[in-house]
């Protein structure tokens, strides 16, 4: 079975948010269309506590229960089967969806007999990359849907693509899904 994983498509990572990815909102319609092609759609959220050490390196963003931590308003959340919260502890950065603290993502995927993970979301060179690397390490076939991800810095995005390719992550267009 295959699953679509939507990484951190939250208000604070979209234009106008506290840690916005330029044009991050452009992934939303692509992701909404992709959802129709999957039986299983999962999502991750950054969900930081006020005193998180994560904010030593980043502006405050995605504070738990805040408007900034909510999914982008145009994202079709009715199609999302489960949400995995990450970065929930004071000393937890939580870049990868596999670092979720409310549920074990790998265990959940294995129980659902998922072998292929298609990843979408924000930001390519941070949470998308770390999620893809962890998924590959855990033995899943990993695909990044190119039109369904967005990053902050083009050079860093290219370096992230190379790092992901080195561990077998594949890149596909939305049409190929």
Segments predicted by a language model, with ranges:
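Active-site acidic carboxylates
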Residues: 1-90, 106, 141, 152-177
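Cofactor-binding loop segments of dinucleotide-utilizing enzymes, especially the Rossmann-like FAD-
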Residues: 7, 46, 122-124, 147
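Histidine-anchored nucleotide/phosphate-binding helix
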Residues: 31-34, 129-137
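Short glycine-rich phosphate-binding loop at a beta-alpha junction
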Residues: 41-43, 114-120
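Alpha-helical scaffold elements lining the catalytic groove of polysaccharide deacetylases
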Residues: 90-112
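A short glycine-rich beta-strand->turn/loop micro-motif centered on a GG-aromatic cluster
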Residues: 118-121, 140-154
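Short active-site-adjacent structural elements
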Residues: 126-130, 151-154
């Amino acid at each position: 079975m295959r699953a679509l994983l939507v990484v951190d498509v939250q208000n604070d990572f979209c234009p106008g948010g506290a840690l916005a990815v330029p044009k991050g909102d452009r992934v939303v319609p692509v992701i909404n269309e992709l959802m129709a092609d999957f039986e299983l759609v999962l999502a991750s959220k950054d969900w930081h506590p006020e005193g998180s050490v994560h904010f030593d390196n980043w502006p405050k963003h995605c504070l738990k229960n805040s408007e900034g931590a909510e999914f982008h308003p145009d994202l079709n959340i009715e199609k999302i089967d489960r949400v995995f919260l990450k970065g929930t502890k004071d000393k937890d950065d939580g870049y990868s969806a596999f670092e979720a603290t409310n549920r074990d993502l790998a265990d959940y995927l294995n129980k659902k007999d998922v072998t292929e993970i298609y990843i979408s979301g924000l930001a390519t060179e941070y949470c998308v990359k770390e999620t893809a690397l962890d998924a590959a390490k855990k033995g899943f076939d990993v695909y990044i849907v190119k039109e369904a991800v967005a990053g902050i810095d083009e050079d860093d995005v290219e370096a992230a693509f190379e790092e992901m390719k080195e561990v077998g992550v594949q890149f596909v267009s939305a049409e190929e899904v």
